[in-house]
């Protein structure tokens, strides 16, 4: 520290030089900048640019090829392409297309399989219509029976009475024949049961009378069969 000079005497000169340089810089920059800008003006400018960007739709078209020129009209809008195609179609083509769609729709309606809901609805309709048909048939039959049982005119009263008597006479023998037939079948069944019960003990008690051997019901011992070769060899003796 002994060899270095003390910087204290040079400090006032340094501050003076700095203030002079700052004053010159402010003088040179002031004419180029103009009046100072306020924050409110900058914010208003920013809001205006933002609104302008919202109102305008910017579309960027990037070519895929090398130096191919960009199309003059945008081809991104699918609705516009579809409308252009529809207008380009002739009247005959449009009519043929409409007819084809109508035919496809009609075929789809005819060939569409029945859903479970349709089958359930058909069954419900059938169930509702069947009781009505049966009640109608019963009512119709009742009308026919009532018309048959109506009284005849005065001149045919005797014939009507005789017909009723004959019908009652034929109905009574038929009713009487039914219990007789039932009684005959019951007696036949009892007689057959008695015959079977009497025959079974006799056949069991007297097995010899039936023509069966004494060792019945035991099986008969069968003699071994002798083949012709064994007989030729004489293995079983002379048969």
From Swiss-Prot:
Query: Entry's InterPro entries?
Result: Tbc1d30_C
The domain of life for this entry's organism is Eukaryota
UniProt-listed PANTHER family: RIKEN CDNA D630039A03 GENE
Please state what the protein is called. Uncharacterized protein C9orf152
Species this chain originates from: Homo sapiens
The taxonomic lineage of its organism, from the top, reads:
Eukaryota, Metazoa, Chordata, Craniata, Vertebrata
